[in-house]
Amino acid sequence: MAVSYPFSSKISHFVPPKQWASMRIARDLEKETGTKIIHFEKGDYQGPDFYTPDHVLAATIQALKDGYVRYDPGPGLPELREAIAAETSKFGRKTKPEEVIVTAGAKHALTMSLLTFLEEGDEVIFPNPGYPPDEVWAKYVRANIKHVPLTKPDWQFDLEKLESMITPKTKLLIINTPQRPNGHLVENPEAIAEMCFRHPNLMVISDEIFSHVTFDKPHKTIAAVPGMEDRTIVIDTFSKTYAMTGWRIGWAVAPVPVIDKLSIFLQDSITNVAAFIQKAAYAAMSGPQDWTVEKTALLKKKRDRMVAGLNSVPGVKCDSPDGAFYAFADITGTGYTSQEYTDKLVESAGVAVVAGTAFGSQGEGYIRVTYACSDEDIDEGVSRMKEANLVK
């Protein structure tokens, strides 16, 4: 007899992210045909060029031997909170350890922040294009989601449009710099802050997971604008800076009253982030930074290689992102929609990318391409794209 499971209606908000579809199709095609797929769709580091630094691995092993396998204080190990506070202060947001909470990745920090502030009927504004998985928990509590379109080609906020969307019910504004999926920095945090000051009930969640992966311009945080330290939750992670994506450790910086609420949430949900992983993160942040400097320089070279290659593909145009490890290429010259181009590319050329519409309606006409892979894969992928000549 079939079982009828009494699922909550809210679980319907949890669906696989659209970018996962590209990965699944590519993986299935690779398995069924034996064809080597060039994986430009993965939002992760690939290959031996990007592996967690050796001293971080060594610190993890030592932490296990030293007995860091028990519960720890929920907000995080004191030494790690101190290190994060010092690092955050370098960007101009003077931070005390008690303003830091260690989380199971940036997504966890964002989830807790959304659930701490939002309830049914509240409004939250997300950028478009953006990162739709971040919206799930707002939907879960039945908050009203608004999308502010970013202006092309540099993907910035139209402040007049943004402010027109704010009502007395608007609690949160989500910003992301460098941005997913296009890699551009938010260039005017001071102007955004000025707008926020006109709306005293508005809080900002600033997703800054690529804060240390910028190339030509320095990273800036809205939390460094005087007065915004009390209005902003800054979210960051060890994933991108130290190639620790699978370790699931990040943090949030916020005023102490907010950290206190997040700490209760964390302790009642996951209890704490694994102590030995926190020791690894401390080793990453407090140890030599040569790896990060070298890998950021390497990513810049790969960015330039990828952008030059994409601009040689028929019907494709691509500008240089300021940071992150994605390029957001304009494929309107091909005559195809984003999804059509994505599907045809993996089927005919064995190159997997993500349709821009996976990140919102403003992504139509674009594809996201990851360049955190080998030079050989970049060259081979671009060569296949050129040979496929996907132009109507």
PLM segments and residue spans:
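Structural signature of PLP-dependent enzymes
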Residues: 262-266, 285-307
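Conserved glycine-rich beta-strand-loop-beta hairpin in the small C-terminal domain of fold type I
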Residues: 282, 298-307, 318-331
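Active-site phosphate-binding strand-loop segment of PLP-dependent enzymes
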Residues: 152-217
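Conserved PLP-anchoring active-site segment centered on the Schiff-base-forming lysine
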Residues: 116-138
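A short helix->loop->beta-strand "cap" motif at the edges of active sites that frequently abuts
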Residues: 122, 143, 198-203, 230
